[in-house]
Amino acid sequence: LAPELLAESPARQDSIEISGGTDGEGVALTVPDLAPDGLGVTFGISFTVDYATESDSVDSGLTVLTTTSDDVSAYVQPMATGVRVLTAIASAEAPGDYTYTFDVPEGTSLVEGVGRYYLSDDDRVLGALLPPWAVDAAGESVPTSYSWADGKLTQHVDLSSPRISFPVLADPAWGYAVEYKLTKTVAANKALLKKCFKCYFPVPGAPKAFPKVGQLLPLMVGPANFNCTFKNEFNATNWFAFQFDATKAHVDKLGSNIVFEFRALSNGTRYLMVSAYVVNDAFWLKNPAYQAGTYVNWKNFASNLNKA
């Protein structure tokens, strides 16, 4: 298994509940709520790895799952912001589809966001999925995609190319998404941020002018380095978003990112959705003050806009 992925696994294995694997029903995973009470709306969630048959062992911080195919192994990796299921595919004869059944309300849909997919039941977001990826043993990308139907997420991996070097590693990763209610329209919130970004974004080092693509943001929280680069802003009808990417000096480490999305639902609900992918789980897990402070910051961000 890829060593760089093992480095992202936190020491805690009890953050994810693993059960089942009997009577051909798959192995169930339960991800707890992440945000402390009053600091944002998150939803714990349960889903089943349908192609897994049992939880076999723990190796290098990963729970090993046996599967219905001799050519496929699965590994559960707890993350500070959720969980990922790594699927190791040994040959072209292995299945190309890997399905996960989510315990979500009827009518839940998969909605594409900025570098994320969200599970939404119209009036709330239940969590975030990172885009699917698959790489072969040579480090080359393998075509992969998601589909969603009736509570089932399927990752499709195209194993047809003769140039693929096996094994292939594929991954759907579940991360945190925290929701905060807003009182103003998407356009009004965007206008406020464009007029004075640091007036509302509650992190020291934020610039007065709305950031430009590639701009370094020297953000600091106490003594901790939160330096980011501004990746881009994204716009659509009733929707506005922007993304920060962590620099090498950031405590979350290079490769981490965070997305802020302003959305208006068909029922009139307006909200700020903050979703993150954190590489440096060790810092997150060893610093509960950082965890709580993160949610306080984003709660204050929404509050500042609501009070304007």
Segments (PLM) and residue ranges:
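Short, hydrophobic/aromatic-rich segments at coil-to-beta transitions
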Residues: 61-63, 81-84, 209-219, 237-246
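A mature extracytoplasmic/lumenal domain signature
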Residues: 91, 102-104, 159, 174, ...
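Cys-His-centered catalytic/binding microenvironment captured across papain-like cysteine peptidases
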Residues: 130-137, 145-149, 289-308
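Beta-strand/loop substructures that line and gate deep hydrophobic ligand-binding cavities in soluble
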Residues: 162, 248-295
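Solvent-exposed, polar/charged alpha-helical surfaces in well-ordered, non-transmembrane soluble domains
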Residues: 96, 191-195, 299, 303
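Hydrophobic ligand-binding cavity/cleft-lining segments
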Residues: 91, 169, 173-225
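Hydrophobic-ligand binding "helix-grip"
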Residues: 225-265
